[in-house]
Design a protein with these regions (language model features):
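Low-complexity, intrinsically disordered short segments enriched for Gly/Pro and polybasic residues
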Residues: 1-8, 112-118
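Positively charged, low-complexity intrinsically disordered leader regions
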Residues: 3-51
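A generic fold-level signal
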Residues: 24, 47, 58, 115-117
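A general structural signal for well-ordered alpha-helical segments in protein cores
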Residues: 29, 60-64, 87, 119
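Gly/Ser/Thr-rich helix-start
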Residues: 34, 58-60, 81
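Residues at secondary-structure transition points
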Residues: 51-58, 85
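Alpha-helix C-terminal capping segments
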Residues: 55, 62-74, 96
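Conserved N-terminal subdomain of the carbohydrate kinase-like
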Residues: 74-159
């Protein structure tokens, strides 16, 4: 439960964190969620496509990117990615979107994806009477491995 301290203009969550006043924060928005590599088959179906355009995507990230691009808000993402070529591609897309990636937790790649992976999202476009269709491949992803202590929340929100 947050409570206001009139003298310092900060907020305390429990007894563990003092939250900075908004005018002293590094970010206008910080999103926490999975950022995946999105594969788009164009006008084709996923099961018949032989090539895909690639993008980044994820609900929470999309909000941060949209606020950055449309309203010039200072945006950051907190997520987990595997330190391999796919993870670095997702990072590059996020940087192109203007979102701060300094709070990404990087996981080592085991060479096979047995211990941790980057999420994939295949998305067919909707047109005419056909609705959009998504097919996620999100098992054992880096962001699902985030646990308490992995992120320095005091650095992000605290004094």
């Amino acid at each position: 439960m947050a409570r206001s301290h009139r003298k310092t203009n900060t907020f305390t969550i429990g007894t563990e964190m003092n939250i900075k006043p908004a005018n002293t924060c590094d970010y206008d928005i910080v999103s926490l969620g999975e950022v995946m590599l999105r594969l788009d088959p164009g006008d084709r179906r996923i099961h018949t496509a032989r090539s895909f355009d690639v993008w980044e995507g994820g609900g929470e990230y999309n909000v941060a990117r949209g606020l950055r691009r449309c309203f010039n808000q200072r945006a950051a993402i907190v997520t987990g990615l595997v330190d391999n070529s796919v993870g670095r591609l997702v990072e590059d897309f996020m940087l192109q979107g203007g979102v701060d990636v300094n709070h990404v937790k990087w996981y080592p790649h085991d060479g096979l994806g047995r211990t941790v992976r980057n999420g994939l999202n295949f998305t067919e476009r909707g047109f005419g009477a056909r609705g959009a269709l998504g097919c996620g491949d999100r098992g054992n992803t880096a962001s699902s491995k985030l646990k308490p202590g992995d992120i320095d929340w005091e650095h992000i929100f605290g004094e």
